[in-house]
Amino acid sequence: MRVVILLVSLIAVPYIMWQVMRIKGNKNITALENVQTGKSVSIFEGNDYALMDVEEYLVYCLPGIVDMGMDDEMLKTMAIIMRTSIYGEMYPELVYQSPYAEEGGETGLEVATGTDSAMYNLIRNGSCLVNEDSLTEVRYDKSELMDKWGGSYYTYMNRLCSAVLATKGQVICYEGMFIVPVYHQVSVGQTVSAQEIYGKEIPYLQGTDSKEDITCDGFSVTQVVDGLRIKKLCDLYCEQNPAAYVDYSKDASGTNEDSSSADDETKADNGRETTAGDKATEKGSADNVDKNTNKENEINILEATEHGFVKYVNVFGKTMTGQTFAGVMGLQSANFHIDQVDDGYRIITIGKGNSLGLSLWGGEAMARQGRTCDEIIKKYYANVDIVDMAQ
C-alpha cells in the first residue's frame, strides 16, 4: 500500500505543480487582455472565431522570432519590429517601400506624405480588423507555449508582456510611413544596402557597421564537399525546379565590371598576398570571381556583390543564382567562397542571412552594452522615427 501511495504521489505532485504554472501563466496576461487599441485580429480558436487586440497578438507571435535568452531591450526591439510588420500588413498602402515589391510597384507615397496626413491620423485614431490568414506572422497558442517552455512559461510570458506593454503602439516609420523592418541573424561584419541585395534603392535600408557579429560562433563555416555530390544535388533540385538553372549570358556584359574589380584587392597591406581563407573571411567571395561560364569541369563564382554575396555561380557549365545554390547546399548565407581542393570543393560561408536591416546578434550586443531599443533600431534602419500610435 505504501508503495502505491508513493507512486501516486510521484505522479500527482508534478501534475498539480504543472497546473499551478498554467494558472499563473493565464493570470500573467490579464493586463494585456484588457488592452484595447482598436486594432484587432480575427483568430480561429476553440472551434470558433474570436477577436484579439494586436498588442496581445504580438505576445503570441514573438516566440517565433525571439530567443528568450535575449536582453530585455532586444525583446522590446523585436516587439516594435513585429508591430511595424503587422501594421504594414494591415495598411499596405502606407508602407513606404518594400524591398520585395515589384519594380515600379505602389509605394504609398501618394496616399500619405507625413505624420500630419489624414490617413496617418485615421490609423492612429481609427479601428481596424484583419483576418489572421492575411498576416504572415505565426501565432502560438497558450498550450503550445506551455509545452515549449515548461516551467519557464510564467517567466517568459512575463518578459514578453513587459516588452510589448513598454512599447505599446510604437512602430518604425520613414517620412511618416511604415517601413518593412527586415532583419537577419548575423551580418558579415557590417550590414548592406537594399541596392546591393535587391538592386533597388531604399533609403532606410543602408549599410552600417556591425563588427560585433564577427564574434558570433559560426560566423564563418568551412566545409569540403565532393564535386559529384554538389552536381547531383543541384541537378536533382533543378529537375524539380526547372527555372533554377538560369541564362547568365544575357547579363554577362556590363553588369559584372564592378564585381570583377574585387580581384584587384587580392593584395593586402605591406604587399602580402592574402589566402583564399583570409579573403573569404574578410570580404566574402568577391576575391574569386571568374566570369568564364564555359568551365564544365569546375564550380566557380561568376559574380558577387561588393561585400561578397554571390549573385551567380557556375556549376559544371550551368548557372545558378547564389541564393539558390546556398539553399540547395544548406549554406547559412549566400555570402560564400569556393575553391577546389584535393578532396573536392572547399566552401567558406560568412554570416547568417542576407545582412540586410537589423542584425539580431549585433542588436543583442548593443543591448548588453546598455543601449536602448530606440538606439538599436535607429542604428540599423537609417533616418527612421519611432512613432507612438497609441497616443
What does each of the following model-derived ranges do?
Residues 1-391:
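Conserved, single-site charged/polar hotspot
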